[in-house]
């Protein structure tokens, strides 16, 4: 036993050596004749008595399997007549290092390792190594992807904050741009206004009336850039605070229209030409339309006039009809217009004769005017007549301001115009004849629109607007334009 302790011998070999070397158990297990092998004489007794005591089991097959694992082999002896009976029961095993008297050799006996598993491991070692390498690469790629994902999250967060700031700046810029555009559109879409000091008092108006007019104007909606029918469709679009102004202005226009219509029907003196008709149709709210061109940003020229005593030569001034917005101004007192209408009625019988003379003179000439030449000649005619009238009046307080129509700002659309022909006949003679009547200018002053039948072939009418302007003795005057709108056949 001391020999086994010095060397590392498996317990199975140690127990087997003790059993075989014990002489007491020779009837069960013993050495062979040459000492190079051992024999199990009685298998049943060995399995029943010895195995449970030393190996904790009683299976002879398990014992034989253990011997095979340590390299022991079963010995088959030659069968003879003498030995055949002895070997029927015994089993002999042999190992090169398991010999009688040589216990030191037991340390060299090793348990066999299954070679099949080792060969399988060697075959799959290369593939396993490849798999391990690939797994390592996958792990590296995963780490890199995680790093990229973290960086992308940081970049996304930064971009989100930048986009938020840009949206705030964009909203602020949009608001600023909207305010600027509204400001510009308000400036461009505002109607022309009349300054307070433009209006002066008339001589026949009571002293208690206020000569200064408020700064009133209409605000037309921006989306209505074309003609707007005020009383029919556009009246609903006007702001509430300006509707009262319209309600006061429209009755004045109606009364003035009736007055002028009744006084503008002179009869021919020689019977050659019929009376000059004035379009005297009943004016209703639906037929009265005003066309406003909001796209013209030019403001009306300010009327500046001096008294007759200061500058008598500058009395004739051209007033652009772009000041038609003054018809929309608030009337402070209805008595002002009533006094003007009463004054026109008193002077109507004086102007009838002068209009008849002018009509007969124009009828005798029977000229064919072109529309452009007629407007130019009419302007020259009025200037000459005003100068002659001022010379005859001897510096009276009353003076006239000439209002010329502009083709861009017609109050009515598609007013029928007369075709006065292409050839201008005896133009110098006409001017000389028109200078002789002394009261032609007074006839033109008391009418807003004068219609004359110039051509015998075409019985059309043309209207000329000349507002009446009067002055007081102190030099102050007040402008009250009367714009009478005659109904036409084609309205919008």
Curated annotation (Swiss-Prot):
GO terms for cellular component: cytoplasm; nucleus. One of its GO terms (molecular function) is chromatin DNA binding. The keyword Transcription applies. Residues 9-114 bind DNA. Keywords: Activator, Cytoplasm, DNA-binding, Nucleus, Stress response, Transcription, Transcription regulation. One of its GO terms (biological process) is positive regulation of transcription by RNA polymerase II. Residues 1-33 are annotated as: Required for nuclear translocation in heat-shocked cells. Residues 260-282 are annotated as: Disordered. InterPro entries: HSF_DNA-bd, WH-like_DNA-bd_sf, WH_DNA-bd_sf. The keyword Cell cycle does not apply. It holds the Pfam family HSF_DNA-bind. DNA-binding protein that specifically binds heat shock promoter elements (HSE) and activates transcription of non-classical heat-shock genes such as PDZD2 and PROM2. Protects cells against heat shock and proteotoxic stress. Belongs to the HSF family. This is Heat shock factor protein 3. It comes from Mus musculus (Mouse). The gene is Hsf3.
């Amino acid at each position: 036993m001391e020999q086994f302790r010095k060397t590392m011998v498996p317990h199975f070999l140690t127990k087997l050596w003790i059993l075989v070397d014990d002489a007491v158990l020779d009837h069960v297990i013993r050495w062979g004749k040459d000492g190079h092998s051992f024999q199990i004489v009685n298998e049943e007794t060995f399995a029943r008595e010895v195995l449970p005591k030393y190996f904790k089991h009683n299976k002879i097959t398990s014992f034989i399997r253990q011997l095979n694992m340590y390299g022991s082999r079963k010995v088959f002896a030659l069968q003879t007549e003498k030995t055949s009976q002895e070997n029927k029961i015994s089993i002999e095993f042999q190992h090169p290092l398991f010999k009688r008297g040589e216990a030191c050799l037991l340390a060299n006996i090793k348990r066999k390792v299954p070679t099949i598993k080792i060969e399988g491991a060697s075959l799959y070692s290369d593939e396993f190594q490849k798999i391990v390498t690939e797994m390592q690469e996958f792990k590296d790629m995963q780490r890199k992807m995680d790093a990229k994902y973290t960086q992308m999250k940081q970049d996304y967060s930064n971009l989100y904050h930048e986009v938020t700031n840009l949206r705030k700046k964009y909203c602020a810029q949009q608001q600023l741009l909207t305010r600027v555009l509204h400001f510009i559109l308000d400036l461009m879409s505002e109607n022309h206004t009349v300054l307070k000091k433009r209006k002066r008092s008339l001589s026949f108006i009571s002293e208690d009336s206020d000569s200064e007019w408020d700064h009133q104007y209409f605000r037309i909606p921006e989306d209505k850039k074309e003609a707007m029918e005020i009383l029919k469709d556009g009246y609903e679009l006007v702001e509430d605070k300006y509707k009262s102004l319209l309600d006061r202005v429209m009755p004045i226009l109606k009364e003035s229209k009736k007055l002028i219509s009744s006084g503008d029907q002179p009869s021919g003196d020689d019977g050659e030409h019929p009376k000059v008709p004035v379009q005297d149709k009943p004016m209703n709210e639906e037929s009265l339309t005003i066309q406003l061109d909001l796209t013209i940003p030019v403001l009306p020229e300010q009327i500046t006039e001096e008294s007759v005593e200061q500058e008598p030569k500058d009395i004739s001034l051209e007033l652009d009809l772009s000041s038609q917005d003054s018809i929309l101004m608030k009337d402070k007192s209805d008595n002002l217009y009533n006094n003007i209408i009463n004054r026109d009625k008193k002077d109507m019988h004086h102007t009838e004769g002068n209009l008849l003379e002018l009509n007969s003179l124009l009828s005798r000439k029977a000229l064919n005017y072109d529309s452009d030449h007629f407007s130019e000649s009419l302007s020259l005619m009025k200037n000459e007549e005003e100068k002659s009238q001022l010379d005859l009046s001897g510096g009276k307080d009353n003076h006239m301001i000439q209002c010329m129509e502009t083709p861009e700002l017609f109050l009515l659309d598609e007013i029928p115009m007369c075709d006065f022909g292409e050839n201008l006949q005896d133009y110098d003679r006409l001017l000389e004849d028109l200078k002789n009547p002394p009261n032609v200018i007074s006839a033109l002053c008391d009418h807003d629109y004068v219609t004359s039948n110039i051509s015998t072939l075409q019985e059309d009418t043309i209207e000329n607007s000349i507002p009446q302007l009067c002055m007081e003795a102190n030099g102050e005057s007040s402008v009250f334009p009367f714009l009478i709108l005659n109904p036409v056949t084609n309205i919008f």
